[in-house]
């Protein structure tokens, strides 16, 4: 008998988002790693494959500060019209409907320069992601996150 599969859908607007800030930067984001049991607001669903997912939002004028991630990351911009992105020395702007690829361990960040809330889905190429920020992220109190 084949394995029984059930549909497990997660509505992005239903995710419990955790506010994340840094004292020494304009970082002010809301984030969820929906399939990571290590994250405080997990959905309880765990992925079986070798990947991980992040959802985050940036209000106008706020940023997700410079950080590195251990695996490669594919970012999909779901909403937003003028999101500044830095990946290593490269600089550019993305908007809703565009993707960008971030190599492993390359410093990168995002700043919402547009008038509306920007929303993103990020897909990591490894099940475990180690993210390192330049300074501690509150309310977690750490600069290195493992999800």
Which ranges hold each PLM region?
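A short, N-terminal "cap"/entry segment at the start of jelly-roll beta-barrel domains
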Residues: 1-50, 135-147
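Double-stranded beta-helix
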Residues: 8, 111-147
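Conserved short histidine dyad/triad with adjacent acidic residue
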Residues: 36-41, 52-69
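Short histidine-centered beta-strand/loop micro-motifs
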Residues: 43-48, 63-69, 86, 93, ...
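Conserved GNAT-family N-acetyltransferase fold
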Residues: 56, 75, 100
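Conserved metal-binding segment of the jelly-roll/cupin
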Residues: 59, 87, 94-113, 123-125
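A short beta-strand-loop-beta hairpin characteristic of the jelly-roll/cupin
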Residues: 68, 72-96
């Amino acid at each position: 008998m084949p394995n029984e599969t059930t549909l497990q859908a997660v509505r992005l607007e239903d995710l419990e988002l955790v506010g994340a800030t840094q004292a020494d930067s304009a970082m002010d984001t809301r984030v969820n790693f929906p399939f990571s049991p290590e994250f405080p607001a997990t959905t309880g669903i765990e992925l079986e494959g070798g990947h991980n997912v992040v959802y985050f939002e940036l209000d106008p004028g706020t940023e997700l500060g410079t950080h590195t991630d251990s695996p490669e990351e594919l970012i999909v911009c779901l909403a937003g019209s003028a999101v500044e992105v830095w990946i290593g020395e490269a600089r550019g702007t993305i908007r809703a409907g565009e993707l960008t690829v971030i190599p492993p361990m390359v410093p990168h960040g995002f700043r919402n320069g547009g008038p509306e809330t920007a929303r993103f889905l990020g897909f990591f190429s490894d099940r475990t992601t180690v993210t390192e920020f330049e300074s501690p992220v509150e309310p977690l109190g750490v600069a290195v996150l493992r999800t």
